[in-house]
Amino acid sequence: MSGYSPLSSGPADVHIGKAGFFSSVINLANTILGAGILSLPNAFTKTGLLFGCLTIVFSAFASFLGLYFVSQCAARLPRGKASFAAVAKHTFPSLAVVFDASIAVKCFGVAVSYLVIVGDLMPQIAPSLGLSSPMFLRRQTWIVFALFVLTPLSFLKRLDSLRHTSVISLIALCYLVFIVLYHFIIGDTVKGEIRYFVPESGFGYLSVLPVFVFGFTCHQNAFSVINEVRNFSQGFVNFTMFTAIISSTLLYLLVAITGYLSFGSLASGNIIAMYDNTSIWIIGGKLAIVVLVLFSYPLQCHPCRNSVYQAIRRSYSAHDMSDGYHAVITLCILLFTHSLALLLSSLEMVLAFVGSTGSTFISFILPGSLYYFFSHKVASPGNSSPLQLRISRAFAAGLAIYGTVVMILCLNINIAKLSH
């Protein structure tokens, strides 16, 4: 351990976070949970019940491993200034800008997809809300409306400031979960074939693997959450991340199992669309989806802005971002994402490729590989034994290899879908 050099900041440079346990968990969970939860019952039609559940649990474990290694890297950096670029400074300094660009592109793409969902759903919901004017039946109207709603939220500097909108998003999600659970309990659905133990086919299983693998992506906000927490102890940070992952896992399992058992092989890519569209409760469910994705947009804008700033300024932390840079970059993200959403009605395949590369890179490859090399260069602030370090490094290497395999698999799956 004598060759290690702990990183520390001077007393005047110490950053004290203000975020508590609840707001940190809420923001991480809201970054994880999205409209993708509604496609899980359909994914189970390919995996079967048992393998679907096992895949959710394994994906949650792999995602938590990535978060754990992120927290281990953050513990070796000056408090409040942790980022992927800051870790890269001590491992692959020439690639720091590539890492930031990858995160920015991934978050930008997801943000655009949220706006496309708003534009697709609101014209369907508008007549039920008494908005029958032709203006309200155009997707462009609602995307522009979203711009006015999201602008003040996107300009907030701290992730912790978004805790209230994150709570609203999770309430909307819980309403969607309630709809699925209620119809499962009363048993008023038409069921297809249900596979309990055997997947439909090997290719069928692999074709829906991205739904599970990318279902727990929140690592782009992990450093921001860590930088803003009031209690910087490793135990507190890890428990915060574990709580977000386990809560999301339970919700995923609940919707996936009850939705699949309700419809079997008939389950569609959006489980809410399977219910009576004339029901006020289902219309409310569609509105809940809009609320969910709308308030998830700022959670993509925040890491996108930080990564763009770090890439432009060759900075290893967005902590020192000036008000001018903050305003200009935020405005550019808002204008470009909304413009792209107005121009394109479907980003399915583009996002599939961005997800295959970006999500895998951020969730598995970066945390695993950066921790593996960083832990050789910078001492842990704790008292890890040589054995503990060897085990951690083995898991980190395994996570990076797993991420690489998943990336190759998912890219091949997307290419196969294109050829069909």
Swiss-Prot record:
GO molecular function: L-arginine transmembrane transporter activity; L-glutamate transmembrane transporter activity; L-histidine transmembrane transporter activity; L-lysine transmembrane transporter activity; L-serine transmembrane transporter activity; L-tyrosine transmembrane transporter activity
Vacuolar membrane side: 41-49, 118-141, 188-195, 262-278, 348-349, 416-420
Pfam families: Aa_trans
InterPro entries named among the record's database cross-references: AA_transpt_TM
Alphabetical UniProt keywords: Amino-acid transport, Membrane, Sporulation, Transmembrane, Transmembrane helix, Transport, Vacuole
Family: Belongs to the amino acid/polyamine transporter 2 family.
Protein name per Swiss-Prot or TrEMBL: Vacuolar amino acid transporter 5
Organism field: Schizosaccharomyces pombe (strain 972 / ATCC 24843) (Fission yeast)
